[in-house]
């Protein structure tokens, strides 16, 4: 099987060969249950995190030198679009309410559900 991958080059030339995954890092996501009385504050925490992520991505995008490849800006724009997707912004709120789990865990559960679709 042949797979062709396109992207931004970091060095000159073409690389051909087998891919070896040395280490698969996973983000250490805190997973804990919350009380029903904490649902609103946990959803607010998620909303604030999404808002801050948008601000940070926009700030990064706005400071990219004009000489940089347009692909970099488009990469950031893609992430901004993901932060507008209800599947990643609203569904975790339902998970927080239904499962009484913290925001990070709810987002991880939703991410896994989307990946396994």
List the predicted regions and their residue ranges.
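Non-catalytic, soluble scaffold/interaction modules
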Residues: 1-117
């Amino acid at each position: 099987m042949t797979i062709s991958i396109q992207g931004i080059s970091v060095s000159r030339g073409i690389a051909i060969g087998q891919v070896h995954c040395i280490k698969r890092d996973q983000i250490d996501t805190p997973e804990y249950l919350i009380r029903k009385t904490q649902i609103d504050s946990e959803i607010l925490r998620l909303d604030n995190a999404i808002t801050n992520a948008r601000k940070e991505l926009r700030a990064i995008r706005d400071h990219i030198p004009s000489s940089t490849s347009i692909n970099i800006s488009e990469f950031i724009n893609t992430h901004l679009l993901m932060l507008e997707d209800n599947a990643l912004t609203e569904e975790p709120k339902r998970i927080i309410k239904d499962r009484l789990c913290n925001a990070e865990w709810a987002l991880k559960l939703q991410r896994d559900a989307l990946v396994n679709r």
